[in-house]
Amino acid sequence: LEILVYINGKFYPRQDASISVFDSGYLLGDGVWEGIRFHKGKFLFLGPHLERLFWGASQIDMDIGKTMDEITEILYETVTQNKMETGVHVRLIVSRGIKSTPYQDPSFTISEPTIVVIPEYKQPSPDTQKNGIKLVSVDIIRGSSKVQDHRINSLSKFNCIQACIDAHRKGGDEGLMLDPHGYVSTCNSTHFFMVKDNSVLTSTGDFCLHGVTRQNIIDICKTNSIPIYEKNFTLSDVYECEEAFVTGTFGGVVPVNEIDGHELKVLGENSIAVLLQSCYNDLVESESSN
């Protein structure tokens, strides 16, 4: 099945989809992106995704050159061109554009932003959803926003890639990252939650991406009277938790079966993670039917 990729108003077969070597996204990681799920004919939680995209662009003084409505039209045109209906994960990428020379100064940009939409059929693994993933704490931290603001969904993922490599070297599926003060922040590609004393805890959010699924889970907890706290906690606290799970656009709610050698129960009796998985799946179906 041939997948067509959108690049600046045109569609190209996947094998022919390419950008200039002078593109600022390729040269410098200069741009922003979103991963968005397309389910039963609708892009899920599109408003928060586009708000984050445009906010991130504003933080790096980048004019996307399109309105949110125009980006929405591009997204739907892409899945229409591909005759896609459901089970799709889309990567929306906006770079600053073409550079006159390989140099970081934005004033050396000589084109409009490069807008790319990559649609792919993707479904989370049922085995992973049921049995969970293994986390390991990594040496790479989420640093100060004065170094790089991790609330921005930047094309430059070097920090996360380093953490991913470290996690894999240690035998983990994901790396659990600390913030500059030694508190647990997030994972390299997902957000971390733990359950302790029948309460759900996640980080303050000061040193991680403002996750759309993360916020949905926080809202679900509040709606269902599940105590939820955004606060600082340490690895020692994590080792004493009863359950843990990670969240993301692609996987939704995924249980954690082990953290640094500490085994955890996965989706057991009276599991809060089970409840949240169910509530999140209900939210997805509700969102797609509206």
Over which residues does each language-model region extend?
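Conserved alpha/beta cores of soluble small-molecule-handling proteins
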Residues: 1-176, 180-181, 209, 218-290
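Secondary-structure junction motif
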Residues: 213-214
